[in-house]
């Protein structure tokens, strides 16, 4: 076996180790959604880079960086209302809105009015990032209708 083939064979795991996974929470339709993107650079790392795409097409779509977090982190999505969404990743809280898709901020603490109802969470299941909707209870509010045009 030539040296080039041997080097290529040894480097192969490093080249295929990067994982870029996406999962979407469709709010009212495919055009109104929150999509979590998880980039896990190397299989041996315990962290991944996270970003969120807020979309309400055709009016707006924007990608927001959430930074690094645990590779298997669960990201919960809460709905306080008014096209605002609160994301909880471990102890970190973020707020994003889908009216203009521009608003995004890290919260220092839980809002005074609370997080709102839990709509579901992004989780890694069997190695794949997935959206797991919260089961609807009798007291849960109806799904938000898309904003008026």
Task: Name these PLM-found stretches.
Residues 80-149:
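Acidic, small-residue rich beta-repeat scaffolds with periodic aromatic anchors
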Residues 20-25, 68-78, 117-121:
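Repeated scaffold domains used in trafficking and secretory/extracellular systems
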Residues 4-7, 45-48, 85-88:
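Short, intrinsically disordered, charge-biased short linear motifs at domain edges
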Residues 4-5, 19-22, 60-66, 84, ...:
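Intrinsically disordered, low-complexity proline-rich regions
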Residues 43-45, 58-62, 72-73, 91-100:
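Short, surface-exposed beta-strand/loop "edge" segments at domain boundaries and coil↔beta transitions
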Residues 16-67:
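N-terminal export/targeting and maturation segments
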Residues 1-18:
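Sec-dependent bacterial lipoprotein signal peptides
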